[in-house]
A protein has these predicted regions:
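Long, charged, mostly alpha-helical binding arms that flank functional sites
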Residues: 1-96
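Basic, alpha-helical terminal appendages of large translation-related enzymes
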Residues: 51, 56, 66, 70-225
Length: 225
């Protein structure tokens, strides 16, 4: 299920649009996407998906991302860019439609980066962009030149994807544990008195009183009797 979602939904968005952009427009995206409403809808889930990652609900986050991918794929199905390309490979409409698809792909890959960093790195090379950051979800690629599309992945086993998710979750948990175990910095002493030990610690001290019965001079010593 995870495998078909990743390949058939997210990556397929790029593979369906990149060829038209490369052949008809020398790799350049349109200055204005065809469907800014769709892209705005994908962007609107930035906080919700971020919160799901923060609460370690990775499965819910991925399901939501895949639902957004469904919307992007449906948009491409409805617009049928391949039909437009048959009559005009340099149609501005074709460029705008495929630019919307590429931008949707970029946004979805940004959402997936916390759990699929290696795959996202390949997407970044294809998109010819700097490493994606969460704040990049607020921006779109316009008038930008992308590279030739190469298959980002041909097969991803569900257990491997789950292993990636588990590894990411483990890193979060280890970081949280480290923070929890780190001792809080000692409070600065502003009383003017030396620090005192707790009574419980004082009670553990073995104090004994001894009576000196006799004392004799120690030969060669100038400070001892």
């Amino acid at each position: 299920r995870v495998n078909s979602d990743l390949v058939g939904k997210v990556v397929n968005i790029a593979s369906r649009c990149a060829g038209f952009i490369g052949k008809g427009f020398d790799g350049y995206l349109a200055e204005q996407p065809d469907n800014p409403e769709l892209l705005a809808q994908i962007q609107s889930f930035k906080d919700e998906i971020g919160d799901l990652y923060e609460s370690r609900e990775y499965s819910k986050a991925i399901r939501l991302i895949m639902a957004l991918a469904d919307k992007a794929n449906q948009y491409i199905n409805d617009k049928e860019p391949w039909v437009i390309a048959k009559t005009d490979k340099q149609s501005p409409e074709l460029q705008a439609i495929c630019s919307s698809g590429i931008n949707a792909f970029r946004l979805l890959m940004c959402y997936l980066k916390p759990v699929l960093p290696a795959m996202t790195a390949s997407a970044e090379q294809f998109l010819a962009i700097e490493p994606l950051r969460w704040d990049d979800l607020d921006q779109l690629l316009v008038g930008h030149k992308i590279n030739k599309f190469k298959p980002l992945m041909t097969r991803v086993e569900a257990d491997k994807v789950q292993a990636m998710v588990d590894a990411t979750q483990k890193e979060f948990e280890e970081l949280a544990q480290t923070k929890a175990e780190s001792p809080a910095p000692a409070a600065e002493n502003t009383t003017g008195f030396e620090d005192e030990i707790e009574f419980d610690d004082f009670a553990k001290v073995d104090l004994r009183i001894a009576e000196i019965i006799s004392a004799e001079h120690v030969e060669g010593a100038d400070k001892l009797l």
